[in-house]
Amino acid sequence: RRLKDWRPSGSMEPFRNLRRMYNDAGVKIYAWKQLSTSMSDEEFEYVFNVAEALGCTHTTLELPTDAAQLKRIGDFAAKKKIYAAYHTHTQGNMTAFDQAFALSPGNKANVDFGHYVAAGNVGGSPMQFLEKHHARIASFHLKDRTTPEHCALNLPWGTGETPIKPILQLVSRNKWAIPASIELEYAVPEGSDAVKEVRKCVEYCRTALTA
């Protein structure tokens, strides 16, 4: 309750300082996640003000199923000129975002292509999803998962069934300005660590984009 009361009066200066620190290190913060359908309009204002202070183009949240909330959030995002980008796990498919897109221009997708594959590529492949929806994708997540037929596993990059290289190449070839996040969700091998594994993922992306 105290946090709910504090948010509307919270200072943006710490977030501006955080943005400067990251920018000075060559890192752009393009999104942050705090939005919730249970928030008041005053809390929405706070979330979008933080997004602006951080330099974000969008704020993310799990995809709601309630049409009224999708419209409320999307219209608020459109007013603030910072998109609401909805994230999916294994409920992601070719039509999962259709309702959100139709209800407000402020609604976009933060699609996870690893989870999309783990859900079974319902309605089309990740590349087909990109071809159809690229203008409404604010950002996407990458991990290498297998299909349900192969236990929907999280595996080291290049050993699963998520078409990471074709996804990156399609985005690059079409010059779609869509940022992507590397998500390290497979088990870190013995003798390695998370930093080493993320470096491997970064190199995998570089190889894809220079092929």
Segments predicted by a language model, with ranges:
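Glycine-rich, proline-tolerant flexible connector loops at the mouths of alpha/beta enzymes
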Residues: 1-17
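Second-shell loop/turn segments in exported
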Residues: 5, 34, 190
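Soluble or luminal CAZymes and related metallo-dependent hydrolases
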Residues: 10, 14, 43, 65, ...
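Active-site acidic/histidine proton-transfer and metal-coordination neighborhood
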Residues: 15-17, 21-111, 116-120
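Histidine-acidic metal/acid-base catalytic patches
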Residues: 79, 96-211
